Amino acid sequence: METFLFTSESVNEGHPDKLCDQISDAVLDACLQQDPDSKVACETCTKTNMVMVFGEITTKANVDYEKIVRDTCREIGFVSDDVGLDADNCKVLVNIEQQSPDIAQGVHGHLTKRPEEIGAGDQGHMFGYATDETPELMPLSHVLATKLGARLTEVRKNGTCPWLRPDGKTQVTVEYHNDGGARVPIRVHTVLISTQHDETVTNDEIAADLKEHVIKPVIPEKYLDEKTIFHLNPSGRFVIGGPHGDAGLTGRKIIIDTYGGWGAHGGGAFSGKDPTKVDRSGAYIVRQAAKSIVANGLARRCIVQVSYAIGVPEPLSVFVDTYGTGKIPDREILKIVKENFDFRPGMISINLDLKRGGNGRFLKTAAYGHFGRDDPDFTWEVVKPLKWEKTQA
């Protein structure tokens, strides 16, 4: 049997880039909670002892940006300079302006347009992907890397591994078999974890704890064998981390946010953007489309692309490819997608309830992936029953 290796990585919530994603989405949540029509484009950057939020926000909401920054950093675990950032004593800089009136009139006619008339907030193309290799209909390499990162945070916060610090990265290589275009995982080839730690712990203790408390509970036994390679803190030392170790910036982990290198990516980031930004809403609706195609048995694996022009409601193009796994021709599936999904930005917002912020709704998306999550707030993960003539099959 011919096999191949494919690798996906993840970072956990204490990684500086992910810290920035979470702050940007916490700001979005705060704006949408008070004013669902908020227009938000919020970027964050961080380096030693400093966090800056900047961008364009037009909202009726009364938002305390500094408090959101400090609360988000504290919740992640950045509570002292030792761990990489002190939430209560770091410098917080804010440079927020209103959305450009040129963009505003082109996209939503200064709020005079009906939902179906609202134009895309920018040009761009987005991809949605789904595969039947996991219950989440997500790639296994990505699912495992993401879950390892989430588990690292869990055992840090619940005290199981008190030597852990917030920053950390994971990477998983899976050996796959190509089954007529579908992807069948055979085994896990390599597991890599690099996690920030305190000064007291030894490398042997780190390796033992990571195997017992992180890898064992996450990776199903059937995928591990005596040949599986483990790289556990291979650099030997990772005490300095968070923004002290590396600068961070919103939108730098777009593959981790999506499909771990599978499918394709149009390049647009998600965090800190309200649903008129098709980088986000467009990517969410094509994930729902791709997932629904696979879940309804139309294909085992699928990618959907949509593209937009600024100020224009209707998409410029929609594309479907089932990698040869479709039960009916791709052109028929494309027809079904167009009949069952409304790709106009204003309608995506309504159908996926994307104007509802607050309660950490979008903050939750900003760590451990936007897709494949079992959470009612992730409305784009709901499978749509597709209307199609079974006689076509």
From Swiss-Prot:
Cellular component annotations (GO), alphabetically ordered:
cytosol
Q: What is its EC number?
A: 2.5.1.6
Q: Provide the binding site for ATP.
A: H15, D167, G168, K169, S235, G236, R237, F238, D246, R252, K253, A269, K273, K277
- Write the gene name: METK2
Chain sites annotated for binding K(+):
E43
Name of the protein described by the UniProt record = S-adenosylmethionine synthase 2
Cofactor needs: Mn(2+); Mg(2+); Co(2+); K(+)
User: Which family does the UniProt entry place this protein in?
Assistant: Belongs to the AdoMet synthase family.
Work out whether the entry's keyword set contains ATP-binding: yes
Q: Which PROSITE patterns does the record associate with it?
A: ADOMET_SYNTHASE_1, ADOMET_SYNTHASE_2
Query: Organism, per UniProt?
Result: Vitis vinifera (Grape)
Which residues does Mg(2+) bind? Answer: E9
InterPro entries, alphabetized: ADOMET_SYNTHASE_CS, S-AdoMet_synt_C, S-AdoMet_synt_central, S-AdoMet_synt_N, S-AdoMet_synthetase, S-AdoMet_synthetase_sfam
Quaternary state and partners of this protein?
Answer: Homotetramer.
Broad class of enzyme this protein falls into: transferase
* Subcellular location per the Swiss-Prot or TrEMBL entry: Cytoplasm
Set out the biological process GO terms recorded for this chain's protein: one-carbon metabolic process; S-adenosylmethionine biosynthetic process
Query: Which keywords are on file for this protein?
Result: ATP-binding, Cobalt, Cytoplasm, Magnesium, Metal-binding, Nucleotide-binding, One-carbon metabolism, Potassium, Transferase
Give residues annotated as binding L-methionine: E56, Q99, D246, K277
Under catalytic activity, the entry for this protein gives: L-methionine + ATP + H2O = S-adenosyl-L-methionine + phosphate + diphosphate
Instruction: Give the function comment from the record.
Output: Catalyzes the formation of S-adenosylmethionine from methionine and ATP. The reaction comprises two steps that are both catalyzed by the same enzyme: formation of S-adenosylmethionine (AdoMet) and triphosphate, and subsequent hydrolysis of the triphosphate.
Coiled-coil annotated residue ranges, if any = none
HAMAP family, A to Z: S_AdoMet_synth1
Alphabetized GO MF terms: ATP binding; metal ion binding; methionine adenosyltransferase activity
